[in-house]
Amino acid sequence: MSSNQQPVVLGKLGSCHGIKGWLKITAYTDSVEGIFDYSPWLIKENGEWREIKVTQWRYQGKAVVALLDGVETREQAQMLTNCEIAILPEQMNDLPADEFYWRDLIGCEVVNTTGYNMGIVDQIVETGSNDVLLVKANAKDSFGKVERMIPFVPEQFIKTVDLQGKQILVDWDPDF
């Protein structure tokens, strides 16, 4: 299964809350509430994904807790502690042409405007001013680099993003 078909992890189930099956939620979405915009969820339990619906959620102090369909006791909830929460890729919102999901950029080849292959996007780091591509350099990098950090600033450094071809064209000196 390609990375674009893999479930998209949005968070994980935390510890139990109370005796009626409530679980604390750790959300990786921009806002904690954002994870509840998606339904149904996929829960990875014993290495297998299964569909589950949230029947209720609420703030509990500074935490967010949820009650899942079919989970009615603390014991049932304990079985789900630390399970990942995901959705299918087709559940994600469509983006404007000039915006990208990070997961789609990971694995893209990065080439500069002179044709030099800078490496592969390994991860993306969120900073205060802009996101930064962490590019794992090729084993035979001419400049002896192991990785490069390239600011994701469209037009200035990021010239084109070809998701179909899995390639990002950058205006970046390979010696940086």
UniProtKB/Swiss-Prot annotation:
**Domain named PRC barrel: which ranges?**
97-176
Q: Which GO terms describe its cellular component?
A: cytoplasm; ribosome
Q: Which GO terms describe its molecular function?
A: ribosome binding
Query: Keywords on this record?
Result: Chaperone, Cytoplasm, Ribosome biogenesis, rRNA processing
Q: Which GO terms of type biological process are on file?
A: ribosomal small subunit biogenesis; rRNA processing
Task: Look up the signal peptide feature and give its range.
Answer: none
Which compartment or compartments is the protein found in? Cytoplasm
Name the HAMAP family for this protein: Ribosome_mat_RimM (MF_00014)
Assembly and partners are described as: Binds ribosomal protein uS19.
Q: Domains: what does the record tell us?
A: The PRC barrel domain binds ribosomal protein uS19.
**What job does the chain carry out?**
An accessory protein needed during the final step in the assembly of 30S ribosomal subunit, possibly for assembly of the head region. Essential for efficient processing of 16S rRNA. May be needed both before and after RbfA during the maturation of 16S rRNA. It has affinity for free ribosomal 30S subunits but not for 70S ribosomes.
Family matches, as PANTHER family? RIBOSOME MATURATION FACTOR RIMM
> What family is this protein classified in?
Belongs to the RimM family.
Q: What is the recorded name of this protein?
A: Ribosome maturation factor RimM
The taxonomy runs: Bacteria, Pseudomonadati, Pseudomonadota, Gammaproteobacteria, Alteromonadales
